[in-house]
Amino acid sequence: MELYKVNSLVELFFEKYKEKKEFKNHVFLKWLKTNDKDFLTWEQVKYNICLLSVYLEENLSKGDRCVLLSENRPEWLIADLAIMNAGGVTVPLFTTYSEKDYEYIFKDCEPKICIISNEIQFKKVEKFISNKTKVISIENFNQKIESIETILEKNSKKETHKIFDSYNDKILRKDLACIIYTSGTTGNPKGVMLSHGGILSNCEGAMEILELLVKNDHPVFLTWLPLSHSYEHTVQFVQILLGAKVYYAESLEKLLPNMAIAKPTIMTAVPRFYQNLFTKISQNFSKQKGIKKRMIQSTIYLGIK
């Protein structure tokens, strides 16, 4: 794909889908917290994006902010692309923000729509949600709040077959894709405004390296860094470019057993990952005795040398 010709992140997904038609029945997204058989194919993801987009378009004007508060899961990517396809701007929130941060962000961005994963996340921000803001949930937990599942079911019954062959082609590279707020450790969180073109440029830079490293036609990612972080948020579009299979880890604590299940061929990492890995290895090392322990010590010594 010639990225310089792509105008938006939405176009990126749909053009990749068209480019590799055989993808449609390939496994694309899988959350390791759910049943082993629960996965989404490229076709299902595309279908859900289109259905959710139709609903969001009825409630959004171009540039309206949409808060997305959720742990990493397949619905995160679906909601993100659906928001942008409907002309909105995604405002991803960390699930670990302080109450003060949540209050500030909601006042600052004035979201038109708030997509929340479950009751736990909803309770964190409930009192900061304006009466003018429409709340949508990923999981069913409140009869007064419409869920994505209900929305998809309703729209699937409508005569909307035409939308599945097209996307919003009015989005330009200069248009705002998302606003990612800093953690607020040095005062109030600062909203970083990222355009479609800016993120696409980062993807282009990443591909210059990854295309040389990823020899496999179907690379496997294990995503564990928060998608609300600008780094991992960009990576999800690199995953699309590579036509990868994506597993979402349960948590940092379960990262190693999740790696054994997903068998990733590529992962994004930060110092915290290596620290966690080193700690686990050190704990196992301390339990070893005799010749096995001496062999490990020799290996470490040679590695350092």
What are these regions (language model features)?
Residues 28-73, 77, 81, 98-103, ...:
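Conserved AMP-binding/adenylate-forming core of the ANL superfamily
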Residues 39-43, 177-203:
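Conserved AMP-binding A3 loop
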Residues 65, 71-91, 95-99, 107-113, ...:
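A short helix-loop-beta submotif of the ANL/AMP-binding
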Residues 200-220, 227-305:
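Conserved AMP-binding/adenylation subdomain of ANL enzymes
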Residues 58, 85-154:
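Structural core segment of the AMP-binding/adenylate-forming
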Residues 122-173, 282-305:
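ANL superfamily adenylate-forming
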Residues 2-28, 47:
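A short N-terminal helical cap/helix-turn-helix that marks the beginning
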Residues 158-181, 188, 214-220:
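Conserved pre-ATP/AMP-binding loop-to-beta segment of ANL
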